[in-house]
Structure formats: structure tokens, C-alpha cells
Amino acid sequence: MNDKLALIKSSIKSIPNHPKEGIIFRDITSLLEVPAAFQTVVDLFVTRYKEKGITKVLGTESRGFIFGAPVALALNVPFVLVRKPGKLPRETISQTYQLEYGQDTLEIHTDAIHAQDKVLIIDDLLATGGTVEATVKLVQRLGGDVQDAAFVINLPDLGGEARLNALGIDAYTLVDFAGH
């Protein structure tokens, strides 16, 4: 692991038994408290995508906003929000997806993505891939083309990367953590 990735990984605190027994919560808020680590995340994403022809960066509620917005600014492209129901003021479409116990729904403005758009999805963490799969479906329903999905953290034991690959989308992740 190079020094940049080591800085990122060491800045992420692991909180055992949160939000429930047996789960280790990977806390990116501790990374945000280390400006050099936060800047490194943004810089690594920008370096990877600056020559890829991305036309929109999309962030998923809510921690995807933290990393997606500065990347969009650096790439000089619009930043698009994907939110929980009822949070976006203009006309939206929604996509429901399954959780371990139940389901959730995401929404996007219908005029945010167009047929020619090459979209980069950014979120903080890739676990099972359910949230990002729903986000991909929203983009595709609006005619956009998801080029890639980028995450600060990957939990490879939960299978999210394979789920994205099955959709024909590469996952770019900076650091891996074992377990849940």
C-alpha cells in the first residue's frame, strides 16, 4: 500500500458493534477531520477521471455528496444528487431496492441526466452494492451511461464489487476493510 492509501486507511476509524452487535462501522467522518486525507481522496478520484470524458458526477445520499461535489468541481462538470424520497423539489423518478431486512428507495431529478451523459457515481462505501445498483438503474432509465463507480472504502467480503461487475460497471475503490 502506498503512502497516500495508507494515510486514507489510517484516518478511517473502525467502531465495533455499531450500529448493531457484530458490525464494525467504518467511520469516514474521522477521515474528514484529517484535511490531508480528505484532499488525497479527492485528488486520487480527480486524477483517475480527469481524462475519461465524464460529463456528470453523481453522489448518493448522503456521504456520496461529501466526496462527489469536490470531484465534480475539480472536473468542471455538474454534480447531481441522488436522494431519499421527498427531498428533491423538481420532478423525480424513483428506484426501490432491497435491503437485508426490508427495502429503500432513491430518487433523482428527471432533468438531471441526459442521453449523452457519461456518469461517474461516487459514494463513501461499497458493501453489498444495493444502493449503487439502484443508482445505476436510475441513470440508465434517464438514458445516461454509467462509466464507473468510485468509493473510498470497499468491504469485499459483502460482494458489492461483483454485483457491479455483473452490471458491466467497474468499481474503483481506494481502501479495503475485511468483514462487515
Curated annotation (Swiss-Prot):
| Gene Ontology terms: cellular component | cytosol
Q: Which SUPFAM superfamilies match?
A: PRTase-like (SSF53271)
Q: Which Pfam families match?
A: Pribosyltran
The reactions it catalyses are: AMP + diphosphate = 5-phospho-alpha-D-ribose 1-diphosphate + adenine
Membrane-spanning residues: none
Q: What is its main location?
A: cytoplasm
Gene Ontology biological process? adenine salvage; AMP salvage; purine ribonucleoside salvage
Q: How does it assemble?
A: Homodimer.
Q: Which NCBIfam families has this protein been placed in?
A: apt, PRK02304.1-1, PRK02304.1-3, PRK02304.1-5
Briefly state the protein's biological role: Catalyzes a salvage reaction resulting in the formation of AMP, that is energically less costly than de novo synthesis.
Q: What is this protein called?
A: Adenine phosphoribosyltransferase
Species assigned in the record: Pasteurella multocida (strain Pm70)
